[in-house]
Amino acid sequence: MTWGFGDCQYRVVESWGKGPEGRRLGIVSSIATDAQDRVYVIDREPNPAIVVFDRDGRLLDVWDQDFLKVPHSIWIGPDDRVLITDCQTHLVYEFPLAGTVVQTWGTRDEPGAPGKPFNQPTWAVFAPWGDLYVADGYGQNWMHRFSADGDLLNSWGGTGSEPGQFDTPHCVKIDPRERVLVIDRGNQRIQVFDKAGALLDVWSDVLSGNELVIDANDIIHLAEAENRVSLLDLDRMVLGRWGEKGDAPGQFVEALHGAWMDSHEDFYICEVPFTPNRLQKFESIR
C-alpha cells in the first residue's frame, strides 16, 4: 500500500527501528538525520536519550545524557551541528555528532521572565546566515533570535491571536527564501517573518501543526496533530493532504509531532503523547 499525495508517494517500511538489535522506544517526540542519513531520535520518556539508527533501522548508538530531562526537539544542520531543546531545564543545547555538549543557551532550571529566554523552549534552528532562532512555546509565547556569537539580538511575539502574536509557537524553520516560518499551533496557522522578526504573512488552513520539513522541490510537508500531513508550496497554497487514523503500518495513532526528510527524500514521522514506540519511516517511491 502506498501513502502520500500527488508526486509525493511513499511506502511504509514496516518494523523500522524495531528489529532484534534495536531498542524498545518510549515516547518519541522528534527526529532528524545527519549528512550520512543516520537517524537521531529523541526518546523522551521514561528514560531520556538520543537513539541513533542507520537508515535501515539498525541501532548504532544511544546517547544516555543525564542532563536531559524532557528533551523536546532535535534539529541537525547541513554541517552536522545538532540542536536540542529541553522543556524542563529551559535550555537549548548544541552538540557535534560525537554527542558532547559544546554550548548551551538559557539558564538551567530557571524559567525566563516574560519575553526573555527561555520558559520551556520547544524548537531551535540555525539559519544559513548564522543566527539562532528559538521558539519559546510551552511556558510563554515568544520567539528569540541570537547572533552566531550567542548574543540575544531581539525577541518578538507575546500571547494572543493577532498577527505577530502566538498561542504556542511550537516549531521554527527557515525556508529557501530565507524567511522564518513559525508554526503557531494554538492559533492553527503558520506565521512568516523576515530575518529580523518582521511579519510578512499569515497562513491559515492548518490543523494544530507540530513540525514542517521542506523537500528538494520546495514542497512543505506539515505534520499536524490531527493524524495528517499537509503539503503546501512556498506561496501558502495547499497542494494536498494525506493521513489516516489507526494503528496499522502507515496509519497514525496519536498526534504527529516530529518529522524529517533525509537525502533520499524518505520521510520519518514520530507521534505523541501517550503511545510508545510510534516511529515510522516512509520510503519515497516517486
Regions found by a protein language model. Give the residues of each.
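Eukaryotic scaffold repeat domains enriched in small/polar residues
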Residues: M1-R286
